[in-house]
Amino acid sequence: MLDLKNLQNNFDEVAKKLKNKKVDENILKKLAELFASLKKEKIALEEFQAFQNKFSKELATAEDKESLKAKLSENKSKINEQSAKVNALENELEEIAHAIPNIPDECVPVGEDENENVELKKVLNPPSFDFTPKEHFELGESLNWLDFIRGVKISQSRFCVLKNEGALLSRALVNYMIDFNRSRGFEFVNVPFLVNGATMFGTGQLPKFKEDMYKVDDEDLYLISTSEIPVTNLYSGEILASETLPIKMTCYSACFRKEAGSAGRDTRGIIRQHQFEKVELVSITKTEQSDSVFNEMLECASDLLSSLGLAHRHLMLCTGDLGFSAAKTVDLEVWLPGQNKYREISSVSNCRDFQARRAKIRYKNEQGKNELVHTLNGSSLAVGRTLVAIMENYQDKEGKIHIPDVLKKYF
């Protein structure tokens, strides 16, 4: 959640940044009106409170005590009424603020959508083929690695069954990713895939994205869309010791997304599924640590792709493509020769103190004061898309898939 005090004190500047992130102008106008009303009602409340304080002290020496008591009683009722007005405005303001995204960093390019994201660099050269490379779903069906028909039969569309060497390769990737991330100093944690509403709120999924979540009927439980959600919230409501930071974690999980806005996109294959697997990086840092830890996380995910021999590029997301909780995001896109283009395989984001304010994660700084932490997250990597990338990049003209050397010991 945004710092409401900063929003109120620097409204025009913050509102301009939020417009770049596609926040509705009517919502910003409503916020401005609420801030003005709240200021007015707080002044009135302070006047009533000042009257109460002043004349309460004079009551003992007043000549007409009964008259003053009556005035103080009447004023106390006004204080209660005015406090209720202020509380109602603060609650309305906070409710609207819950659906307002994070402010983009100064380095984030202003743009409308993914077409205005900025390429930062390319890593490795895409492979060349003396034949027309196939897409992963063609390879997967011919090798009996991917069973879409039975996936749909037991579930619905956008579900797939992995079989034979395809399932083994997926498992090998998970183990390799966890080991690689641990070698870079990230502690492995294993968390529940079902979390409560407060946890979903803490990382920004609720209330704005409620319709995109899978919820258990009659229970306050949601299936996670990313392990960022439970891992970040491991420390919700806590005050951490300064010397314990940064906390750097990696986690494997299944992820569940309705993909409501993706009708007609990636309808073939396993690029976009309702259930998929991901190995995540999550870090909790002091303010001054978050930029360097962001670079560490980005380097970890990029080096992991390089270790698999997969050509990829770094993209800085523009304001219009930036996620709800993120202040800055760099996407990694892997080269898929079957599609003849780069596709997203990782997003590394710095959320600054936005999630920490919602989840109430703080640390005691060197001056002994409680300060909000910064939270960061990133995929290292999306398992299914890495499987896709290996299938397409390591295929031969006979339709066989060669396994990267670093994975062979995991079979």
From Swiss-Prot:
GO MF entry, a single one? serine-tRNA ligase activity
What's the source species' lineage? Answer: Bacteria, Pseudomonadati, Campylobacterota, Epsilonproteobacteria, Campylobacterales
Q: In which pathway does it act?
A: Aminoacyl-tRNA biosynthesis; selenocysteinyl-tRNA(Sec) biosynthesis; L-seryl-tRNA(Sec) from L-serine and tRNA(Sec): step 1/1
Top-rank EC class of the record's enzyme:
ligase
Q: So what does this one do?
A: Catalyzes the attachment of serine to tRNA(Ser). Is also able to aminoacylate tRNA(Sec) with serine, to form the misacylated tRNA L-seryl-tRNA(Sec), which will be further converted into selenocysteinyl-tRNA(Sec).
The gene that this protein is the product of is: serS
Q: What is its main location?
A: cytoplasm
* Keywords noted in UniProt: Aminoacyl-tRNA synthetase, ATP-binding, Cytoplasm, Ligase, Nucleotide-binding, Protein biosynthesis
Task: Tell me the protein family, please.
Answer: Belongs to the class-II aminoacyl-tRNA synthetase family. Type-1 seryl-tRNA synthetase subfamily.
Asked if the Swiss-Prot or TrEMBL record annotates the protein with the keyword Ligase, the reply is yes
What reaction(s) does this enzyme catalyze? tRNA(Ser) + L-serine + ATP = L-seryl-tRNA(Ser) + AMP + diphosphate + H(+); tRNA(Sec) + L-serine + ATP = L-seryl-tRNA(Sec) + AMP + diphosphate + H(+)
Domain of life from the UniProt record: Bacteria
Q: Would you tell me the protein name for this molecule?
A: Serine--tRNA ligase
Locate the residues binding ATP. Answer: R257, K258, E259, E344, I345, S346, S347
Q: Where does L-serine bind?
A: T226, S227, E228, E280, S379
Biological process, per Gene Ontology: selenocysteine biosynthetic process; seryl-tRNA aminoacylation
Q: What transmembrane ranges does the database entry give? A: none
Cite the EC number. 6.1.1.11
Domain comment text?
A: Consists of two distinct domains, a catalytic core and a N-terminal extension that is involved in tRNA binding.
